Amino acid sequence: MFLGTYQPNLIGKGRVALPKKIRNEIRGERIVLTVGFEKCILGFSEKGWEETISPELSQPLFSDSKARDLRRKMCAEAEVVNLDSQGRFVIPEKMLAYAGIKDELTIIGAGDHFEIWETKNWENYRAKAFS
């Protein structure tokens, strides 16, 4: 389970090291990233991604426009990303732009996935959502 809040440094353009506690939950050399709903990036282990997206893929394709929209958003923007031996990876440029990440980022554990936020956006969201 992905837990905790971390503020790793960006290493160069979009390169970041996953915190060890997050990395320990991945159990592999690849992760799946996609855009989130609150201008953040969602991260999954490959198995976690399959478990998350499978129910969405079983929704009625022709009769449910909201299910189609969610499927498109989740899948069209998703990318499989390789981790190096230290758990470092490059966040795709389009995802950095979507989330507004330039200098500082925050990674939060969210149970079955983790999220990558621009730090100020996370702090603002947290202040509103948790007050």
Residue ranges and their predicted role:
Residues 1-8, 12-15, 22-81, 85, ...:
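Flexible "stalk/tail and boundary" regions
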